[in-house]
Amino acid sequence: MSVELWQQCVELLREELPAQQFNTWIRPLQVEAEGDELRVYAPNRFVLDWVNEKYLGRVLELLDEHGNGLAPSLSLLIGSKRSSAPRAAPNAPLAAAQVSQAQANAAPASAPAPAPTPAPTKRTTQKTEEISEEPSRDSFDPMAGAASQQAPVRAEQRTVQVEGALKHTSYLNRTFTFENFVEGKSNQLARAAAWQVADNPKHGYNPLFLYGGVGLGKTHLMHAVGNHLLKKNPNAKVVYLHSERFVADMVKALQLNAINEFKRFYRSVDALLIDDIQFFARKERSQEEFFHTFNALLEGGQQVILTSDRYPKEIEGLEERLKSRFGWGLTVAVEPPELETRVAILMKKADQAKVELPHDAAFFIAQRIRSNVRELEGALKRVIAHSHFMGRDITIELIRESLKDLLALQDKLVSVDNIQRTVAEYYKIKISDLLSKRRSRSVARPRQVAMALSKELTNHSLPEIGDVFGGRDHTTVLHACRKINELKESDADIREDYKNLLRTLTT
C-alpha cells in the first residue's frame, strides 16, 4: 500500500510542480516499502539535501491527506533500492528532522514506557505517530527510573529520519571529521590543537577553548574531536551538546527532583563538548552547576572542549571563576578564512557534491563572500541549484545571475568610502588626513592599511583606488598593499589592526 500511496503523491506533485523541477528533483527518486516505513532513495547527496529542504513538507502533507490516517513513516537515503545498498549522506542537514503533525482527535496515551533499548523505537497508531527515544549511555533523561509514576507524553509529531542519523543522542555529527576540514592560515592553530586533544586525550590541552565568529568551523572541529575519540575507542562516553541543552537538562532535573542523576551523568563522561558557552551568561544557577561539573571532570582527568563567539574574558555576565578556569588549558581563535582557504573550501564542497566548479568561478565567489564558511556554502548551493535549473555549466556569468542580490548587497556594504571612514575612526584620525599628502607615520600607515583593505574588499582597480585616495598613482597603491602584507607577517600590532578592521567591514 505504501508504494502505491507514494506513486499517488508523485502524480500530484507532477501536476503541481513545473516540469523542469519535477524532472530534476522528484523523478530520480526511488522508493521501497518495509512494513509501515517508506524508504525514499536519492541518487546523490545534493538531490537529498534539496528534496529535504524544499519538498519534504509538501510530501508529508500529501501522504497525510491521502493515507486515510495510515500515512507511513518516511526515511530519506542516498543510493538506490535493495539492488544497491544505501550509503551515508555526507553533511546531511538533518540528523533526525522532526515535522510537527498536530492530531486534534488523538486519544491520550496511557501505555507505560517500554524497556530501555540501545536505539530509538517507533510506535505507530492510527491517530498519531509516537516516538519513544529511550536513554542511552550518551543522553541524559531524568524521566528514566520514574516511568511508573509519570504518564508518558504523547509526541504529536512525525519523525522523518534522514540517513546519517545517530543511533543514540550524543548529538555528534559523524560527517564532521578532520579529513574533510579545510585547513588554512586562519584555522591552522585551532586545527592542530583539536587534533592534539583528539589523538592524546587527557594528555593534551584541558580544557580546549575555541572562539571566533559564526560559521568559521569551531563546531566542525569539536565534532571532529568527538568522532576521532569514538573511532579510537567505540566504548568511550563522548557527549556533545549546545549549552542551552545543558541548561534545559538541568531545569528538567530540578523539576523532577533528579538533580543527583543529572550530576552523575555529566560527571561520568569521558569527554564533554559544549558549544556556544556564551549562552551561560547571566544564568547563575546553570553557571553554578557547570562550575562544579567542570571541576569534577578536570580533577578526574576527563576532557572538556568549549566554544564561544568571543574570547572568554569578553563574555559579559559570566562569573570570573569560570573565565579563570577556561584559561587553564589552551584558548585558540578561529579567524575568518583568507582568500586561498575560501577557494579551497568551495572546491572541496563542489567535489563532495560531484559538481564541476572551474577554479576561476570559485575564485570569483571567494573574492566576494568573505565573512564565513556558512555564507560561502550557501552561495555555492544557490549557484549549483541555478546551474541545475537552467541546464547550464557554472560560469562567472551564471554566478552573477544567481547571486546578483547578494553581490549587490556586498558591493553596497563594502565601499572605499566606508573603508576610509572605518579606518579613520579606528586610528582616530580624520578622513581628510587619509587623502592628504602628509607622510608622518601616524597618517601614512593607516592610509596604507586603508588602501590594502580597498584592494582586498572591493572590485576597484589600483588606479581607481589611488584616485579616491587623493589622486595617487597606482604604483603607490601597489606599494602600500605589499608593505601591509609584509607587516602582517612581522608586526603583531599591524596584524591585529588589519584583522579587526577586516572583521568590522565584513560582518
Swiss-Prot record:
UniProt free text on domains: Domain I is involved in oligomerization and binding regulators, domain II is flexibile and of varying length in different bacteria, domain III forms the AAA+ region, while domain IV binds dsDNA.
Region (Domain II) location: 87-170
Span list, region Domain III, AAA+ region: 171-387
Protein name: Chromosomal replication initiator protein DnaA
Quaternary data: Oligomerizes as a right-handed, spiral filament on DNA at oriC.
Region (Domain I, interacts with DnaA modulators): 1-87
Keywords associated with the record: ATP-binding, Cytoplasm, DNA replication, DNA-binding, Lipid-binding, Nucleotide-binding
Location(s), subcellular: Cytoplasm
Single GO biological process annotation from the record: regulation of DNA replication
GO molecular function: ATP binding; ATP hydrolysis activity; DNA replication origin binding; lipid binding
InterPro entries recorded: AAA+_ATPase, Chromosome_initiator_DnaA, Chromosome_initiator_DnaA-like, Chromosome_initiator_DnaA_CS, DnaA_C, DnaA_dom, DnaA_N_dom, DnaA_N_sf
HAMAP family reported for this sequence: DnaA_bact
Family membership noted in the UniProt record: Belongs to the DnaA family.
Reported function: Plays an essential role in the initiation and regulation of chromosomal replication. ATP-DnaA binds to the origin of replication (oriC) to initiate formation of the DNA replication initiation complex once per cell cycle. Binds the DnaA box (a 9 base pair repeat at the origin) and separates the double-stranded (ds)DNA. Forms a right-handed helical filament on oriC DNA; dsDNA binds to the exterior of the filament while single-stranded (ss)DNA is stabiized in the filament's interior.
Pfam families assigned to the protein according to its UniProt record, in alphabetical order: Bac_DnaA (PF00308), Bac_DnaA_C (PF08299), DnaA_N (PF11638)
Gene label: dnaA
